[in-house]
Amino acid sequence: MLTRALMLTGTLLASTLVDAQVFSRELGDFDLKLATQPSRSMAQGLVKPTIPGSTFHGGLDLTHDSGWYVGQWAPTMGIKPGTNLEVDSYLGYKHPFDQTLSYELGMIHYSYPKLSPLDSQQFYAGLTVLGTRLGAAFSNDPNRHDSTLFADLGVNQPLGIGVSMKYTTHQLGTPVSIAEGGSVRAFNDWSIKFPRPFMGIDLNLIYSDSSLEGAQCSAYSGQNSQCDGLVTLKAERAFY
């Protein structure tokens, strides 16, 4: 079911030196980065190793000239009530053939030292061909598996509008019962985004939906903000 909703979100992102510090140094064939902001994204930039609502950002990233990289990140320190310490470690390999073709492979391990049974892994791969980015990720979480396909088609000229898409299949280890009877064991969700910069503001028109509807939405736990179809217009501007 498509919910006829238009959400307008205006976000002003204020950045300071305190929350955007990056220390970088070359160590022979290695490039070391220590940062309080994410210094890397995976699968050709289509996978983000962070989570919403993080209370602390800090970590290191070490890259070798051969294309191998390794790093560790603490997206949350468990300071706020109801949150737990999380330490993410990743290992990957990125190789460009030329300026138009490159690929990337890797794995992220999500660790919760105080909640060890919740540890999980995410495997990812990405390919860039003539400005188009394609990616895939598979998450092996406790009691569920998520498989995601990404596509970023780049910017269409002369309009300057980009197109990116995401499609995810969710398999639940334990079926979720719904009020009207029956249960949900698997579902899909997807989103398509049209970004465009305008006078220093990043505009994003996003449509998202899922395969669930009606009472089934009580079992939704996917990537979108809600189960039903939603159109969102988001405006962001960063001040430095």
Give the positions of each predicted feature.
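Solvent-exposed loop/turn segments connecting transmembrane beta-strands
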Residues: 46-53, 77-86, 110-120, 138-149, ...
